[in-house]
């Protein structure tokens, strides 16, 4: 008698809010029970199938690929893939079902089965035992490929149900098979499954009723239990089906697009031709021999691995962007490639940098290289639509991102499902929103008014812990495109994205890596938009024709500005953590900037590399090298490994790793905190280094640094790509501050700083800011010349909250035909409605036509009255009404309410006497305060950051009328005074002043909320980004 069984109907947690176990948990349990195979049949999706495939391989248990579907007004079926034709048919069916309805839903019709779907086996899951007519239709449609699924879950009438189903199968002459309708790997997940069901139906568990399964039997049961429930023939039948389902994802064969290659060329010869053209463009006087050899080596490897079409595809996208004058730049590991530089994809000159091509691609890697290209964020859509036009929507789609449950969302969903009232849900999420450890934050709960011993609270937290990390839904990748020669839905299902004119495949980037599909990342970067806008402004107003390539390099005033941490608004080094590092590192060259970009990251910090590097840079510590070979690797960073490439090179040079093995080490570094896998490298490194004469202490030190890189260390090539934009933005801020500030505001939202902070910084740099004025303002902020000085910034109509761009464009067109005589003339010629005119009046934009705000609002109201019932009739002259001029504080309040900023006095100027009475010093006063002295400071909160580099420390930026103050809030104080920390707009800090050279900050000891002093003024703060 055959003792085995194959489960043919099983949901993973990629049946969102239904399946209560991961694929790995399911396969591990199935292997433990002695199953012969396991089908993963998530509902109308293959989103989790690659993970299931990897889980199956990890336990050496066959995976059967399938999907549960429900026909509209019809039966529930389970479709199982027999071979590659069946896989393609299933992908096409899911695509059709998902594309014909909105995101997150599907629709399958009986007509979808009018044509045969070869290679699919069909299980029918009847809801009643007398569905004879339904069975006849299914038999006629699927014939010999149809089975009746018998599902027994220890209900009161299992035996009667079994007999009736077998009788139905016999009557219809359909073979019957045992199946479990599995929703979880173990019975212990029942509470989570019930909770997820309640979440899905938007009801509390207590009211879910028959929506819940009656017991916990929908788990992977032991063979002994199954033999008690089912006749052996039904269990044996499961094995017959399993033996027929032989398809493996490894059989998929992806083909690159071919239309980019002219008929007279092969892909290889065409790539070489384009590269040679690029060499002539990049190096008009000829490239160095080492660069030409690097290019030849790369082209040889690209041809050997068959990736020519990938490079041609990326080149084509970049070519289109450059022709449309869209700024773009490749980054990431692709910047290690000399071929990418020659093709114009990246901007890191291999003649000036040490490249590690193996970081980008190597013979040992089992997937294509990954090229990321940033485009202007405002024009990226043009590039995306070009790709769709070029390849068609059947051959191009965006990659999915699997959105997973984090603590805050999981707590809210679980607490709501368990019936907690909204105020308690909010308080609980506030207490535990950043909870990541297995142990609940008991003290936080007590502070929030909760009893940690409460059984209900314990249940909420237990279920939350199980739910964290579960997939919640698929969302759209920011710009990862999959492009293929064959229709994509022969490889993976495609569905609608939430955004119009977008389609996404059901796999994410990790899935693509696993099965070897090409992905091109077409990403958006706000700083590229700002730089392009700045170039446009300089061309229009300053008659300068600049580009990224023509910005003067190695400019001393620019580096001096950077070393002072005068970097508000620039790229990458604008955060408080970066600003605090700049006066310590004091960059003097481009390579210093590369290091600056990379060093303020969790990897170098947690690997203990930052302080040794700074000490060596400041000649406080001697440079030492374990060997001459490693000196070559580490010399450029003073003997301290700061980059991923250096760690890989150390493994190659000191421990005899091959380049491909070094790349596997990099991957293990990136994933060890989530998945482990570094320990084998520890032994291998130690053995290899010992063999080559390195001490055990050095091997242990390197391994600890490698673990630090598991917390996000930068590749050098990526840091160099970003440093190019860092330098460009800094040069523009230093030499063309008005155009740069203007471009930043016009490109907002982007970066760390609000328009208000950018304008306040511009004023501190003695730039003239002119108010919004319908007589001069365009939609965007603009420049107005001042003889012999930096131009003034004219605030644009975009600054007015709620004002429409189309109204601004109407004003521009009307003004081009002649100046406005008064408010009525403006309203009539620009076609403005009452709402638009009121917004202009409140924002002070009618000052030049009507006087102050009160008078402007009065005139707008009068114009509307004339345009109302009495339009066209003679109007009586109304005497002038004496309206009071707004006070300074009234103007200040209305400025912030309508514009988010003010050109009047800073709010703290008006409060300075009150703050002095509270013993608060200004940021200017602090310049004279000695290190270690106790001080009190108050300011508007413009930023709160809790970076991963900081071990729970929160950095707060306070702004007053003279500048900014950096505040450090240690974790214990942040926990004790959390409400004040996160809720204050005007914050007083009592603490200890610290200064070391140009590095200054306040260590907080006590926080006080002074927000009521603002009388309702609201200031924007960038929090926890």
Curated annotation (Swiss-Prot):
GO CC terms, sorted: cytoplasm
GO biological process: DNA repair; DNA replication
Keyword Acetylation found: no
Chief location bin: cytoplasm
Catalysed conversion reaction: DNA(n) + a 2'-deoxyribonucleoside 5'-triphosphate = DNA(n+1) + diphosphate
Transmembrane segments: none
One Pfam family matching this protein: DNA_pol3_alpha
Location(s) in or outside the cell: Cytoplasm
Domain of life from the UniProt record: Bacteria
GO MF terms held by the record: 3'-5' exonuclease activity; DNA-directed DNA polymerase activity; nucleic acid binding
Assigned keywords, A-Z: Cytoplasm, DNA damage, DNA repair, DNA replication, DNA-directed DNA polymerase, Nucleotidyltransferase, Transferase
EC number, as in UniProt: 2.7.7.7
Annotated HAMAP family: DNApol_error_prone
Protein's job: DNA polymerase involved in damage-induced mutagenesis and translesion synthesis (TLS). It is not the major replicative DNA polymerase.
Protein family per UniProt: Belongs to the DNA polymerase type-C family. DnaE2 subfamily.
The protein, known as: Error-prone DNA polymerase
Organism: Pseudomonas fluorescens (strain Pf0-1)
Name of the gene encoding the protein in the UniProt record: dnaE2
């Amino acid at each position: 008698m055959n003792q085995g069984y194959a489960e043919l109907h099983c949901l993973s947690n990629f049946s969102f809010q239904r399946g209560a176990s991961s694929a790995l948990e399911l396969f591990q349990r199935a292997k433990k029970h002695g199953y012969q195979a396991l089908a993963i049949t998530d509902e109308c999706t293959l989103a989790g199938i690659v993970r299931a495939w990897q889980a199956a391989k990890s336990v050496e248990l066959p995976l059967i690929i399938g999907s549960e579907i429900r026909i509209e007004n019809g039966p529930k079926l389970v479709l199982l893939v027999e071979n590659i034709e069946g896989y393609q048919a299933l992908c096409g069916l899911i695509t059709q079902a998902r594309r014909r309805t909105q995101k997150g839903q599907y629709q399958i019709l009986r007509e979808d089965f009018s044509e045969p779907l070869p290679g699919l086996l069909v299980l029918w899951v009847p809801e009643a035992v007398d569905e004879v007519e339904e069975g006849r239709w299914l038999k006629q449609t699927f014939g010999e490929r149809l089975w009746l699924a018998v599902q027994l879950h220890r209900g009161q009438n299992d035996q009667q149900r079994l007999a009736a189903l077998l009788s139905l199968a016999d009557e219809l002459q359909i073979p019957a098979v045992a199946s479990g309708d599995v929703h979880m790997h173990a019975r212990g997940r029942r509470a989570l499954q019930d909770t997820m069901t309640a979440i899905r139906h938007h009801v509390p568990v207590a009211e879910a009723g028959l929506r819940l399964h009656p017991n916990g039997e929908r788990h992977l049961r032991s063979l002994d239990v199954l033999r008690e429930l089912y006749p052996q023939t039904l269990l044996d039948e499961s094995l017959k089906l399993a033996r027929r389902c032989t398809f493996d994802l490894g059989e998929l064969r992806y083909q690159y697009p071919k239309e980019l290659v002219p008929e007279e060329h092969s892909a290889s010869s065409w790539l070489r031709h384009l590269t040679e053209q690029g060499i002539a463009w990049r190096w008009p006087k000829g490239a160095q021999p080492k660069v030409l050899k690097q290019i030849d080596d790369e082209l040889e490897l690209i041809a050997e691995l068959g990736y020519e079409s990938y490079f041609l595809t990326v080149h084509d996208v970049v070519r289109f962007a450059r022709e449309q004058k869209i700024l773009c730049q490749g980054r990431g590991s692709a910047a290690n490639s000399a071929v990418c530089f020659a093709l114009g994809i990246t901007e890191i000159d291999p003649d000036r940098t040490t490249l590690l091509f193996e970081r980008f691609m190597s013979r040992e890697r089992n997937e294509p290289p990954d090229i990321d290209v940033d485009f202007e964020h405002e024009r990226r859509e043009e590039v995306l639509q070009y790709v769709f036009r070029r390849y068609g929507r059947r051959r191009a789609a965006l990659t999915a991102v699997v959105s997973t449950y984090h603590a805050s969302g999981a707590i809210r969903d679980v607490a709501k499902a368990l019936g907690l009232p909204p105020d308690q849900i909010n308080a609980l999420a506030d207490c535990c929103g950043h909870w990541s450890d297995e142990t609940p934050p008991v003290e936080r709960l007590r502070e929030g008014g909760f009893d940690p011993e409460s059984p209900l609270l314990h249940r909420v937290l237990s279920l939350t812990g199980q739910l964290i990390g579960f997939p919640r839904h698929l969302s759209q990748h920011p710009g990862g495109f999959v492009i293929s020669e064959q229709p994509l839905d022969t490889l993976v299902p495609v569905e609608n994205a939430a955004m119009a004119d977008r389609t996404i495949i059901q796999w994410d980037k990790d899935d693509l890596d696993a099965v070897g599909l090409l992905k091109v990342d077409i990403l958006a970067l706000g700083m590229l938009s700002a730089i392009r806008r700045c170039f446009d402004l300089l061309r229009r107003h300053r008659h300068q024709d600049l580009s990224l390539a023509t910005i003067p390099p190695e400019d001393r005033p620019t580096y001096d500005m950077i070393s002072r941490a005068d970097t508000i608004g620039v790229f990458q080094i604008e955060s408080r953590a970066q600003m605090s590092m700049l006066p310590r590192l004091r960059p003097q060259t481009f390579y210093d900037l590369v290091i600056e970009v990379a060093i303020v990251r969790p990897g170098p910090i947690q690997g203990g590399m930052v302080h040794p590097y700074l000490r060596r840079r400041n000649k406080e510590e001697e440079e030492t090298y374990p060997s001459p070979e490693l000196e070559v690797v580490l010399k450029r960073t003073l003997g301290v490994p700061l980059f991923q490439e250096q760690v890989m090179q150390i493994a190659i040079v000191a421990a005899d790793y091959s380049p491909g093995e070094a790349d596997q080490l990099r991957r293990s570094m990136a994933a060890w905190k989530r998945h482990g896998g570094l320990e084998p490298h520890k032994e291998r490194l130690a053995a290899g280094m010992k063999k080559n004469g390195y001490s055990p202490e050095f091997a242990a030190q390197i391994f600890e640094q490698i673990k630090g890189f598991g917390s996000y260390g930068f590749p050098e090539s990526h840091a160099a790509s970003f440093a190019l934009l860092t330098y460009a933005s800094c040069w523009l801020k230093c030499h063309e501050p008005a155009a740069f500030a203007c471009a930043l505001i016009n490109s907002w939202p982007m970066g760390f700083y609000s328009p208000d902070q950018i304008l306040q910084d511009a004023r501190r740099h003695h730039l003239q800011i002119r108010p919004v004025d319908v007589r001069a303002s365009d939609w965007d902020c603009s420049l107005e010349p001042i003889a012999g000085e930096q131009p003034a910034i004219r605030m644009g109509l975009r600054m007015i909250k709620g004002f429409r761009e189309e109204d601004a464009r109407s004003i521009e067109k009307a003004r081009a035909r002649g100046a406005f005589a008064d408010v009525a003339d403006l309203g009539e010629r620009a076609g403005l409605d009452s709402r638009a005119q009121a917004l202009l009046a409140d924002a002070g934009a009618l000052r030049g036509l009507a006087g102050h705000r009160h008078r402007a609002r009065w005139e707008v109201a009068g114009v509307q009255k004339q345009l109302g019932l009495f339009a066209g009739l003679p109007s009586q002259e109304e005497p002038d009404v004496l309206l009071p001029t707004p006070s300074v504080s009234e103007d200040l309040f209305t400025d912030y309410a309508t514009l988010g900023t003010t050109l009047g006095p800073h709010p703290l100027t008006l409060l300075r006497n009150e703050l002095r009475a509270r013993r608060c010093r200004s940021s200017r006063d602090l310049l004279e305060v000695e290190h270690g002295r106790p001080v009190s400071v108050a300011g508007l909160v413009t930023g709160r950051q809790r970076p991963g580099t900081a071990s729970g420390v929160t950095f707060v930026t306070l702004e007053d009328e003279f500048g900014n103050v950096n505040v450090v809030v240690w974790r214990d104080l942040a926990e004790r005074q959390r409400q004040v920390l996160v809720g204050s707009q005007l914050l007083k800090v009592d603490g200890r002043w610290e200064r070391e050279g140009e590095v200054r900050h306040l260590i907080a000891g006590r926080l006080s909320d002074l927000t009521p002093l603002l009388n309702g003024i609201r200031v924007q703060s960038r929090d926890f980004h």
